Amino acid sequence: MKKGLIAKKLGMTQIFAEDGKRIPVTVVQAGPCVVLQKKTSATDGYDAIQVGFLSQEARKVTKPMLGHIKAAGQGAFAHIREFRLDDVDRYNVGDVISADAFEVGEYIDVTGTSIGKGFQGVIKRWGFRGGRSSHGSCFHRAPGSIGSSAYPSRVFKNKKMPGQLGNERVTVQRLQVVRVDAADNILLIKGAIPGAKNGIVLVKDTVKPR
């Protein structure tokens, strides 16, 4: 039974297991999410549900999106995402999905936007070794040769070079749910997840259950 939620990353902390081991966890506010649309193979070619998260003022939402939301009989939402499922019949438009959809010990995948680091060199961006620090070296953090002059007289695609680091979509797979607070829609997830504090992430069943 697949499921997915939109969540907000609140930060990291640590908890202690019964055997005294310290576990680093990420705290996320998972839901409540409202089902806005149900897609089926018969009507759309695939099975999925569209959910909204965090209420928003109507004036801050585009008119086409506002009309789409009102067709579902709901108010405006700040974030709308779609999750592909194989059993959409379980859901109806207007249903609320909360953090208790997940269980302690369950494994999940978390998708978010990594923290942007700006324009960085090849050492920070790709882990290049760099040149010598002394003995007359004039080559410290430079990328070195990026191709030959005679042939092919061009730079190959995907050559590792300086550029923008971070600020891209990242998925971390097979993270374990350590604790579920259904009253406050809080999930404690073992380990780190991509993104900054208060960033929006997608929490869904892992594609690697074993």
Swiss-Prot record:
SUPFAM superfamilies assigned: Translation proteins (SSF50447)
Protein name: Large ribosomal subunit protein uL3
Signal sequence bounds: none
Functional description taken from the UniProt entry: One of the primary rRNA binding proteins, it binds directly near the 3'-end of the 23S rRNA, where it nucleates assembly of the 50S subunit.
GO MF annotations, alphabetized: rRNA binding; structural constituent of ribosome
Keyword Ribonucleoprotein (UniProt): yes
InterPro entries, alphabetized: Ribosomal_uL3, Ribosomal_uL3_bac/org-type, Ribosomal_uL3_CS, Transl_B-barrel_sf
Family designation: Belongs to the universal ribosomal protein uL3 family.
GO CC annotations on file: cytosolic large ribosomal subunit
Domain of life assignment: Bacteria
Assembly description: Part of the 50S ribosomal subunit. Forms a cluster with proteins L14 and L19.
Gene Ontology BP terms: translation
Organism per entry: Geobacter sulfurreducens (strain ATCC 51573 / DSM 12127 / PCA)
Keywords per UniProt: Ribonucleoprotein, Ribosomal protein, RNA-binding, rRNA-binding
